[in-house]
């Protein structure tokens, strides 16, 4: 890539000329090297790719036009100093940056920027080190490019797996750092990934480096006197043991936000529990969801249910095991009779509860007796351990996931339809049978009105449930894509009307969801806007992320 070459990206950021872009990119090349810069100048570069080979140009699961959210270039900093230099240049040009870790972010927009023409800042390509694993404190420190699979392999390669487990989401290829700051979940007792972080290092919009919590306390050896750069200085001994530090707790400002660029994070790991047993409880009837959730609530609050368990709809499990055509020749949403037939064929229930027991055998035995006794109140329930199920069963997959072993089997449900793509609709529900049934009824009805099957799961936290509706669609069917847009927008309004809000969403729906958080004349959004404009006066970091826009961007013009 020549320094004198003129680049012509397919799209430019707002208010920036082609000459501005070229001056900016040439300066970037001088910082990171041409091998770490890719300008998107040809439609041949807009390839959807796959989960294992993710694209960084756009959203591969595009519900809008494929190039609706499109980067002008992809830039991969090599280190913290590069990030700081890039931020400085971006301020000079008011050039929008869209930081990513790995860029998978499946179902929520991938690596695509909210503002087309932004530079996607690929934090994970070069910054991919496991910086520390501390056995005594049971934590690790990682850079953005470390995936769950990378961290698992690191533990195994260093003979640490018998001492420490990590917590993994459904798919093992995501960034440990990225998933935590997006407040993703896993399925061990450490399943709330944001809760399990302690200490972050962040490049602010002015280029300054910040460490949060106890990380703001310098090492008493004063390493800066030894000539170390701030990013290379050792952390306080307790930075990754106590997350809050002193004074205002600011970590949340860098979660699902556009207030800074996270370069390092401390994550708690789970000490090997010295015993483990996964299980499946099948619920035969659709209406059993209500009673099951009411049984789950006291068990989860009392911690008899130790991990983050899931209540999965039959079609989520069925879709892991085969596409829709393998079960039915119909293109319409499947009927209750067909769902019953599939459940019988797969020896599953209409709902299927996956959980795990942790600890020595006497502890597991008492917990299992408690759980089994409680669920036995539901007529027709059945109980399974992995060895009771076929080799390809979902329980065999969840058996790995719930002990922190990364897998990729859950990718298969995206192929439920031809040219499969997906979005997640992710409202929060009370751990209440009545609320679960209401939310299920609303989402299922709207899915069917859009001509789609309901595919979903309830992920049970301590006092709430993430209801993850997996909206699978044919991305080459323009009519179906328009229906999916209608479906998402209608579900957002439906849920807001019932007092339910979403915890995370796709790029295209961030504005609408933020507008539902409108108590007291949207004081929450207005406060975030004040902070955004104060810490990022040029609006360079991820404008529009989570519906928070800097003052340079008109809400009327940019809102979707």
UniProtKB/Swiss-Prot annotation:
Noted pH dependence of activity: Optimum pH is about 10.
Active-site positions on this chain: 108, 503-504
Pfam families for this protein: FAD-oxidase_C, FAD_binding_4
GO MF entries: D-lactate dehydrogenase (cytochrome) activity; D-lactate dehydrogenase activity; FAD binding; vanillyl-alcohol oxidase activity
Feature type site, description Important for the catalytic mechanism: 170
Disulfide bonds: none
Reported temperature dependence: Optimum temperature is 38 degrees Celsius.
Main location: other
Notes on activation and inhibition: Competitively inhibited by cinnamyl and coniferyl alcohols and by isoeugenol.
A cellular component annotation (GO) from this entry: peroxisome
Function: Catalyzes the conversion of vanillin alcohol to vanillin, and also the conversion of a wide range of phenolic compounds bearing side chains of variable size at the para position of the aromatic ring. Crucial for the degradation of the secondary metabolites derived from the degradation of the lignin. Catalyzes besides the oxidation of 4-hydroxybenzyl alcohols, the oxidative deamination of 4-hydroxybenzylamines, the oxidative demethylation of 4-(methoxy-methyl)phenols and the oxidative hydration of 4-allylphenols. Most active with 4-allylphenols.
UniProt protein name: Vanillyl-alcohol oxidase
UniProt organism field: Penicillium simplicissimum
